[in-house]
Structure formats: structure tokens, C-alpha cells
């Protein structure tokens, strides 16, 4: 029995007695116990109190390394008896021990107590290790799942804290009094050496208990043997490494100039579907469409939106099953669409520059993809990409015919235009020369009349301000002449023609000359009717017509209009 001071147990320093006893039982089904029994002789509580110290709190790894150990499941107990014997033991302690009154004595007692506890813990760990090794040496290889020690769950910092758990308070007292006395330094040095020995011993024990054979070594040996067999047989082997590596997603740089960057990021994780997955998704989509058609029929019959209970009753299922079917069908539809977005992008790129930007083309292509997913029947034996390709292309072309032209063309004309372009391109690649209209009509199956209508259809408008030329430094408005512009040559020709007409009209009578000039607007640029001319001249309308006819007969004479023939040739 030795006097000590333990802050963990609330007892006077000179009245605390410690008894260590360890009991090991034979390896039977009922496991034995290891007892740690400190007794306090100054407690005044009338009842027998038993406090439990868990092994995990002491952090003794030798008890946790083997799940089949006879003592790993037990707890450490200490009993504190109270009763009539307390006073007698207290008097004996007073007679045999000396009270610790000075600070130096307190420090020495604390150091001695910590050393005793550390030695006891080391002894118990050694005994437990020897007992475990003598019990069954084959337990290490029986089950690899149970060989992992809880010691690995703690970091180096936590291990150091666990090993110093029993003497935390003592270390604080010693560190405060380390400069008080030379004798205290010697005690502290002994305490630290004992703790260092305990740390080394406890760190060696987990390394021994964790010597479990890894399954990766067996896998590596099997792969090496397989590689040697392939080498011996002449088959080149591919080096895959010591362990299967997971595919790493390389973080690609975001191209902010890409108009479809957000769409690409959304669909980058989606994979291509297998035939089996397409069958499953198609079945889920068809079930969803069936339920939606049933809801539409109920709406038409009742004139209002049916409740969920009515919908479930009409479908012949309960509400929970109906909700699950709707949710499953929606997920199938979303997965089918997301997995084929890349197909839409590849088709939409072929129609760039036709009057719509790429984002709008992809949007219209997605509408065609949704339509194709709803109409797809996997039982026909075709892949979904083959079937949806035509729906996507049709949606893109229809949007181009409706939105890309200022002068809208019928959809059948747009389709014929695409057919003519494809036939012309194919014939040129085969023959190396531009095909004739007859060859194009034969390749497309169109009549010549229909082909000419397609070729004469309005072309997409172009801006007069867009850049053209090799260096993109010209505009169409700068190089295209205005067909309505009047040139100086035209002005000169008109002036000569006016003079020649005046000479011809001078050969007519006065009334005939005046009627012709009023009739064709040669006075003020406005052509007058026979009635207006008759009122101005004070004659009837019929008389004006007779005067006009007489003037035309005279003008048809070749002698008068011979020098006017040159203007007819110039106009033609």
C-alpha cells in the first residue's frame, strides 16, 4: 500500500489505498474479468457504490486487437466499500502513513502515483499479450474483418493524449513546480522515462496485433501469374498497374465563347444508353403517356380537371401506385432526353448559317427529340438514336421554314429545296462537274415544272451592310448598282428624244399637236382623258377621239418616224 494523490478520485491524498489484482480465466465460453480495484477509506456514503471504468477510457490496445480475446469485452471496476470498517482503516492509515503537507511532498507523491499506475498498465498489457498469444495463434488469420484495432482510429495526437490520461493532472502539478526544487526534477525525469517506455511498448503491440494479410497482395500475385502465362504463350499483356484505377474526370477549362457551354456541362455526366436501358425507358414513357391520355379523357368528359383520387380510380390503382408510376415515367423520359442531347447538337450544327443561331436550332431539335421519345417503340428492334434522328431533323427544318425567312415559304417547298441541294451536292461529288437541271430532276423525283418553281423560290435576304470580299472590307451597298438610278447617258438620250418628238409633232396640225401633247402628258406629266380634253377645247368627247385618230395616221408615215427608230432599239 502506498500513499498517493489522484485528482480523479475525490479522496484525501493520504487516505487512498490501491490494490491491483488481475485474474485470468481459462479460455471458456464465459470470459473472465480483469479487475482494477482502488479503495478509498474516507467515504461516508452508507451504501456500496461501484463505479465502472471502461477499457476504452484507459485506451489499452491489447484488449481491443482481438475480438475473441477473453478479456476484451470486460470492464475495469473499482469498489468503494463503506461501513464500520472505514474508520478502522482510516485510523490504521493515520498510524502508518505520514500526511502530505508541503508542496514538494505533494509533487513527489503525484509523480510516484503516476509511475505506479504506468507500471501497472504496462504489466497488465504484457500479461494480456502473452495470454492472447498462448491462447490461440491461429486467430489472426481466421477473420480479416475483425483484426483491425481501434488503435488505428486515433491520430498520433490522440494516442499521446490517451497514454497520458492517467497522469494529466499530475503533469500539470509537476510542470508548475518544476523549478521549485532539484529533487522534483529527478522525480519528473523518472516519470517521463517511465512514460516513454510505456509509449514504446504500447506502440509496438498494435503493430504486432495488426499483422493481418492483405487481400491486395493475393490479387497482385494472381495478376503477375496471369501476365507470365500470357508472356509465355506469346500474347502481349497490357500493364494495368497494381490496383484498378478509377477514371478521373479531368476538369476542362470552360470556354465562355461556346454558346452551348451550360448545355454541355449539364449533359457531360450522362452516358449513352444500352439496348436494354432503351427498352426499359421506353416502357416507362409509354406508361406515362397512357396515364396522361386517361387524364385528358377524364377532363373532356367532366369538363374540369379530375382530382388525383378520380385519376387513380380510373386507372384501377391506388393513389400511391399512381404517383410512383408517374414519377417513374417522368424519370425515364428525362433520362432518355438527357442521354441524347449530344445527338441534337450534332444535327443542329449542320444547319448553322441558314438564318437562325445555334441556340435556337438546338432548342427546336430538343422539341423533336421529345416527340421522338414519346413515339419510340423499342419492340420494333431499332435503336432510339436512329429513330429520333428524323424527328430532330424535321423539327429543325420546320423551324427554319417558319422563322428564318422574311418571306415565308410553305414547308413542302422548303423540303423540296433541301432535296435539290442534297442531290446537287451528291451529283457534283460523283461526276466532278455541276449537274444539269434534268439530272437534278431525275435524282430528286421532281418534275421540271416543280424543279423550276423550287429554283425560282425567294432566296434568304441579305443585308446590304454585311462585310464581303477577301478582306471583309466591302459592303454590298458599295458594289451593287441601283437599277433605278438615272445616269447622265439616260438624261442625254431623253433630251435628244424630246427634241425629235417636237420636230415630228410640228409636222401635224395645231389641234392634232395639242391633243397628242395633252393625251400623253407631255405638258405637265399628267395624262388627260378624252372628256377632259373636250371640255378644255369646247368640243365633244367623240370629236377629240377623231382628232387623235387622224394624228396617229399621220405619225405612222415612215417619213415622219424614220429618225425615231433608233430610240426603240436603245430601249429594247
Curated annotation (Swiss-Prot):
State what the entry records as the consequence of deleting this gene. Answer: Pale green seedlings exhibiting a strong reduction in plastid-encoded tRNA levels. Aberrant chloroplast development; normal etioplast in darkness, but abnormal chloroplast in light characterized by small size, poor thylakoid membranes and stacked lamellae.
Quote a single Gene Ontology cellular component term: chloroplast
Q: What is its main location?
A: plastid
Annotated DNA-binding residue span(s): 530-549
Using the UniProt annotation, give all residue ranges assigned to the region (Disordered). Answer: 215-249
Q: Which GO terms describe its biological process?
A: cellular response to light stimulus; chloroplast organization; DNA-templated transcription initiation; regulation of RNA biosynthetic process; response to red light; tRNA metabolic process
Location of the motif Polymerase core binding: 360-373
Induction and repression of expression: Induced by red light, especially after dark adaptation. Moderately induced by blue light. Induced after two days of imbibition.
User: What are the protein's UniProt keywords?
Assistant: Chloroplast, DNA-binding, Plastid, Sigma factor, Transcription, Transcription regulation, Transit peptide
Q: Which PROSITE patterns match?
A: SIGMA70_2
Expression sites (tissue/organ): Highly expressed in cotyledons, to a lesser extent in leaves, sepals and siliques, and barely expressed in roots. Present in seedlings.
Q: Transit peptide span?
A: 1-39
Annotated GO molecular function terms are: DNA binding; sigma factor activity
Cellular compartment(s): Plastid, Chloroplast
Against Pfam families, the record matches this protein to: Sigma70_r2 (PF04542), Sigma70_r3 (PF04539), Sigma70_r4 (PF04545)
CDD domains listed in its UniProt record? Sigma70_r4
What role does this protein play? Required for the transition of plastids into chloroplasts by coordinating nuclear and chloroplastic genomes under light conditions. Sigma factors are initiation factors that promote the attachment of plastid-encoded RNA polymerase (PEP) to specific initiation sites and are then released. Promotes the biosynthesis of plastid-encoded tRNAs (e.g. trnE-UUC and trnV-UAC).
Q: Which family does it belong to?
A: Belongs to the sigma-70 factor family.
Q: What name does UniProt use for this protein?
A: RNA polymerase sigma factor sigB
- Organism annotation: Arabidopsis thaliana (Mouse-ear cress)
Q: State the gene name recorded for this protein.
A: SIGB
Amino acid at each position: 500500500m502506498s500513499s498517493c494523490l489522484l485528482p480523479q478520485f475525490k479522496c484525501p491524498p493520504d487516505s487512498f489505498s490501491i490494490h491491483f489484482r488481475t485474474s485470468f480465466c481459462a479460455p471458456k465460453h464465459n470470459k473472465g474479468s480483469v479487475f482494477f480495484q482502488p479503495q478509498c477509506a474516507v467515504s461516508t456514503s452508507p451504501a456500496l457504490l461501484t463505479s465502472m471504468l471502461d477499457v476504452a477510457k484507459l485506451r489499452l490496445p491489447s484488449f481491443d486487437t482481438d475480438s475473441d480475446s477473453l478479456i476484451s469485452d470486460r470492464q475495469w471496476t473499482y469498489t468503494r466499500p463503506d461501513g464500520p470498517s472505514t474508520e478502522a482503516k482510516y485510523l490504521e492509515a493515520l498510524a502508518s502513513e505520514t500526511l502530505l503537507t508541503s508542496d514538494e511532498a505533494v509533487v513527489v507523491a503525484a509523480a510516484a502515483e503516476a509511475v505506479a499506475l504506468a507500471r501497472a498498465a504496462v504489466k497488465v498489457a504484457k500479461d494480456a499479450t502473452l495470454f492472447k498469444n498462448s491462447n490461440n495463434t491461429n486467430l489472426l488469420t481466421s477473420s480479416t474483418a475483425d483484426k483491425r484495432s481501434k488503435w488505428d482510429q486515433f491520430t498520433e495526437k490522440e494516442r499521446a493524449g490517451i497514454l497520458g490520461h492517467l497522469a494529466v493532472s499530475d503533469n500539470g502539478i509537476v510542470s508548475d513546480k518544476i523549478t521549485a526544487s532539484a529533487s522534483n526534477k529527478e522525480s519528473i525525469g523518472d516519470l517521463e522515462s517511465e512514460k516513454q517506455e510505456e509509449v514504446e511498448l504500447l506502440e509496438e503491440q498494435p503493430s504486432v496485433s495488426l499483422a493481418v494479410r492483405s487481400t491486395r497482395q493475393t490479387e497482385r500475385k494472381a495478376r503477375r501469374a496471369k501476365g507470365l502465362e500470357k508472356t509465355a504463350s506469346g500474347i502481349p499483356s497490357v500493364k494495368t498497374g497494381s490496383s484498378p484505377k478509377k477514371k478521373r474526370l479531368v476538369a476542362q477549362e470552360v470556354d465562355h465563347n461556346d454558346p452551348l457551354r451550360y448545355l454541355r456541362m449539364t449533359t457531360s455526366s450522362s452516358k449513352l444508353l444500352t439496348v436494354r436501358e432503351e427498352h426499359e425507358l421506353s416502357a416507362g414513357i409509354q406508361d406515362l403517356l397512357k396515364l396522361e391520355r386517361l387524364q385528358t379523357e377524364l377532363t373532356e368528359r367532366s369538363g374540369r380537371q379530375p382530382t388525383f383520387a378520380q385519376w387513380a380510380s380510373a386507372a384501377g390503382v391506388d393513389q400511391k401506385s399512381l404517383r410512383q408510376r408517374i414519377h417513374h415515367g417522368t424519370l425515364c423520359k428525362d433520362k432518355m432526353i438527357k442521354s441524347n442531347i449530344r445527338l441534337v447538337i450534332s444535327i443542329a450544327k449542320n444547319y448553322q448559317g441558314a438564318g437562325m443561331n445555334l441556340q435556337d436550332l438546338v432548342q427546336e431539335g430538343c422539341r423533336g427529340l421529345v416527340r421522338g421519345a414519346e413515339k419510340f417503340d423499342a419492340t420494333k428492334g431499332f435503336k432510339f438514336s436512329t429513330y429520333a434522328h428524323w424527328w430532330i431533323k424535321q423539327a429543325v427544318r420546320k423551324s427554319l421554314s417558319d422563322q428564318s425567312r422574311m418571306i415565308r415559304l410553305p414547308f413542302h417547298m422548303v423540303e423540296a429545296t433541301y432535296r435539290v441541294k442534297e442531290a446537287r451536292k451528291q451529283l457534283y461529288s460523283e461526276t466532278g462537274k455541276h449537274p444539269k437541271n434534268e439530272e437534278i430532276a431525275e435524282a430528286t423525283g421532281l418534275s421540271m415544272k416543280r424543279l423550276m418553281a423550287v429554283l425560282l423560290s425567294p432566296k434568304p435576304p441579305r443585308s446590304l451592310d454585311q462585310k464581303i470580299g477577301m478582306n471583309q472590307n466591302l459592303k454590298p451597298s458599295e458594289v451593287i448598282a441601283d437599277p433605278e438610278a438615272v445616269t447622265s447617258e439616260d438624261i442625254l438620250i431623253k433630251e435628244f428624244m424630246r427634241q425629235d418628238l417636237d420636230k415630228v409633232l410640228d409636222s401635224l396640225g395645231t389641234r392634232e399637236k395639242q391633243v397628242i401633247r395633252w393625251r400623253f402628258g407631255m405638258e405637265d406629266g399628267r395624262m388627260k382623258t378624252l372628256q377632259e380634253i373636250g371640255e378644255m377645247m369646247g368640243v365633244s368627247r367623240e370629236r377629240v377621239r377623231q382628232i387623235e385618230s387622224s394624228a396617229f395616221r399621220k405619225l405612222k408615215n415612215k417619213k415622219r418616224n424614220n429618225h425615231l427608230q433608233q430610240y426603240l432599239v436603245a430601249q429594247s
